Amino acid sequence: MGGISIWQLLIIVAIIVLLFGTKKLRTLGTDLGESVKGFKKAMAEDKSQDANFDKVEAKESTSTTEKTKEKEQA
C-alpha cells in the first residue's frame, strides 16, 4: 500500500514498449546518451577555460602591479 512494487514497474515498462516500440525507444536512448556525453564534454571544456582565465587574470594583475611600481619610481 502506498509504494510502487517491482511488478507495477514492469507492467508500466511493458506498456511503454508496446506504445512506442523498441526501435523508437532505442533511438530515444541513443539521443539521450549523446546529449549526456555532449553536456559532460562542455562542462570539461568550461572548467579548462575557467582555469585559463584564472591564469590570465593573475598575469594581468602582476603586470598591473609592475606598471604601478614603475610609475611610482619615475
Curated annotation (Swiss-Prot):
Region (Disordered): 51-74
Protein name (record): Sec-independent protein translocase protein TatA
Gene: tatA
Sorted UniProt keywords: Cell inner membrane, Cell membrane, Membrane, Protein transport, Translocation, Transmembrane, Transmembrane helix, Transport
GO terms for MF: protein transmembrane transporter activity
Localization per Swiss-Prot or TrEMBL: Cell inner membrane
Entry annotated with the keyword Cytoplasm: no
Record has Transmembrane helix as a keyword: yes
Job description of the protein: Part of the twin-arginine translocation (Tat) system that transports large folded proteins containing a characteristic twin-arginine motif in their signal peptide across membranes. TatA could form the protein-conducting channel of the Tat system.
Species per Swiss-Prot/TrEMBL record: Haemophilus ducreyi (strain 35000HP / ATCC 700724)
